[in-house]
Amino acid sequence: MNKQFLLASIVAVATPVSAMAQSAVIKGTVVDSQNNEPIAGVTVVVQGTKVATITDENGKFSLKAPKGAKQNLQFSCVGYETQTLAGGQISGDRDLGFVPMSQTSVALKDAVVTTRAVARKTPVALTTLGSVVIEEKVGTADFPKVLESTPGVYVTREGGGYGDSKISMRGFKSENIAVLVNGVSMNDMEWGGVYWSNWAGLSDVASSIQTQRGLGAAKVSTPSVGGSVNIVTKSTDAKKGGYFSYGMGNDGYNKLTFNLSTGRTKNGWALNLLGGRTWGDGYIQGTDFRAWNYFFSVSKELAKNHMLTFTAFGAPQVHNKRSNYDGLTVQGWQDVQQYMPYKEKYRYNATFGYDNQGRVRHSAQNVYHKPQIQLQHLWQISNTASLNTVAYLSLGYGGGESGMGTAAYNSSWYGTNNGVLNMSFRRADGTFDYGKVQDLNEKSESGSQMVMTMSNNQHRWYGLVSTFTKEMSERLNVYAGVDLRSYVGTHNNRITDLFNGAYYIDSYRANVKAANNSAAADPLFKYQKLSVGDIVRRDYDGHVNQGGVFGQAEYDYNNLTAFLSGSLSYTNQWRYDRFYYEKSKAESESHGSLGFTVKGGVNYKFPHIDGWGGQHNVFVNGGVISRSPYLLSSLFLSGDVSNEINPNAVNEKIYSVEAGWTYHTASFNFNLNAYHTIWQDKAMARSLDITDAAGNADRGLINMQGVNSLHQGIEAELDYKPVKWFSVRGMLSLGNWIWTNNAVGYFYNSQGQPLADAKGKIASGIYADDHAKMTLNQKGVKEGGSAQFTASLGFTVYPMEGLRIGLDWKHFSNYYADYSLSGRDLSINGVKNFETPWKVPAYNLVDLSAGYTFNMGGYKTTISGNVENLFDQEYISQAYDGAGHDWQTAYRVFYGFGRQMSIKLKVNF
């Protein structure tokens, strides 16, 4: 970059003064095409002349070009594709406005595996958010909040605890969305989902977020169905300096963050360090939280063409939750007003309470730390080839609280049952009476009837992703790579509190068969008196080993770009159970399966039609995915308690096609696309509420195989900045997501045992003749759980230097309630006819953000603030369909958050 600066300066000074009198001033601002952030250090040359300059730190440039001749402007910068603007005859001064530049796919300075697609070149639907947008919009919300204005994306906070948000994309839930950090997968290896509370600090270190909807173009061997979210962290080539920030918000929200960067030193070293702490009371009653986050990255240029980067990041946290099962009916929420003021009732938490000593108690606390360590080697083999290798290690520690009890009292831990408030242990003020639990256990002559356990989930996960990229010619680029992973997850429950009881007898021990574990042959085995620290319910390891290869060829000829990619992966999975099996029988059979993807697409870029910038593109892509079954709820139907492998487990198949059109100028971008996705042989589980013969409530599930669905829709988004002091961004997404076949489901209780009837009788085995099953007639029925129509429109105004004011409107509608089942639906060889679920009322939200940057004592300082749900709109964000398919029978209803406010001070140094 220094050489470019020197060259450009010499050329500019050498330009004859006499020519300046015969010249015109050309100026503009160069921005990143993906996030509209200004690019400093871009060399701007008037081709055929010696006129050149470079952009300043705000991306601005100004030069004087000779009048009278036709000239082209060339823009070049390390890490970006050279851009040439074909200009007409230069007759006078002109302002080009914003000039976008696209990032190159091979750049030594980018010491991360980005898996980014290039806008308007790669034929996929994508949206990129830069660090500025992330910082402006996140406020006090969870990290996924910033994706709400992305087409096809729906974000819900579920129970409302810290980091408990969930994302769906094009109607596909989190286990079908690939989440990557620097190109490394974050999805759980056993079931595919992501817990965002484990990554709550990513908003502080993210330089960009790119969502690729549909099959995408990410460089991994295992595919996504709904799309991918790739988070790229800040690299070590940041300039020297740092910042300190403090933020505060409603409900005791506080956040401290510091960042320090050395910049690139003369000997090739660079260090970037970030740390932060967040704490608060939580918007929902009794959901206080304490969280920390850290990011450490150090890199070294080993030689001219080699760079080694070590990165470690994590976000340890402790937060109390509101169970996802503890939503009420619509009327139930109105009745809660007897316990909480009118405006507060939607914050109610059915399991928040006190014990006899006046201590605050919870039954849904989550504690977790999932650090990830990455070591990356980037080798620029030549000007046309590079090898990028990342080895990583992830270690997970922690778990979540889970109340347990005898058959008569296990359901007493539930805050609600089928949307109805559980009154068994309810105080007059509506809080849960943990003191009554203590009294019950103290009086019991058979030990504690109700205890608290910690559901521990630990893992050891390591892997390697290596990608070789080669520019075969000016027209052909190829890449190929390997993706290797090894994972072991340990899961058990340990007693943490006897609630004043003398001991506890684990009812799950009665399910241990002597044929599998000889200890169960002892009549006293199931009556053993257990205490704090003892294991109950389950104790097993889930093993997943996966290896894959992937590759892509991209052909670029004039205005046509085409790509063909594929991947092949082999997954081997098994269980090792220490609770239900003795050592000689603890390890299950292993199950291996082969998965693959084939994707292809073309993009055509029409010639410039507006002289200096107007550009039309059209693209089409399609592909096929065959995905191996997940270990839980597919390969092992009773994954917590049994080594028995599902004999009917098959790969899921996905077929998708997509087409789109884009138009962009230096100041205006518009994207329009349509998609059609067929999903076959999906494995799916739904919750189940039953009542046993003794009248005790229980929660289980129905496991379905061979479910088919159709997801299709239209998406549009625009980004317009006509003048430097005003910009507008909007999107619209219309989906049509339906089930396309009738599925067969088998029933299990909360202990993972197959059920024979609606009263809790245990079947003789999985898929045995007496195993209760049911045909679910759902063909043609709308899928629930996500808004099928979303829209947003955001305005940002810069009324004076340093001041920013933003207003965002968001609309959500066509949200159909999800479904679960109850014991009244359960019958051997029965049929359940589904109808169109209840459509939740549409709602609109408005968010306000503002910031002012100024100089304070020589330090760049920013004061910013956010107001979410500015007008305090009441709305339903999540619901399950009831028997009447209406608001009166809908249950597990959650209302969204009311008005949230925050303010932050950030000082750069």
Describe these PLM feature segments.
Residues 97-99, 200-245:
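A beta-strand signature from Gram-negative outer-membrane beta-barrel systems
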Residues 31, 35, 42-47, 74-81, ...:
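Short, acidic, small-residue-rich periplasmic hinge/interaction motif at the N-terminus
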Residues 572-579, 590, 604-657, 676-705, ...:
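Surface-exposed extracellular loop regions of Gram-negative outer-membrane beta-barrel proteins
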Residues 6-8, 21, 313, 359-360, ...:
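Conserved C-terminal beta-signal and adjacent last beta-strands/turns
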Residues 241, 248-279, 284-322, 331, ...:
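Transmembrane beta-barrel wall of Gram-negative outer-membrane proteins
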Residues 556-559, 676-678, 700-821, 906-908:
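Gram-negative outer-membrane beta-barrel transporters
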Residues 299, 307-376, 401-454, 517-530, ...:
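Acidic/polar loop-and-plug regions of large Gram-negative outer-membrane beta-barrel proteins
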Residues 62-64, 166, 185-213, 232:
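Short acidic/polar hinge/loop motifs at secondary-structure boundaries
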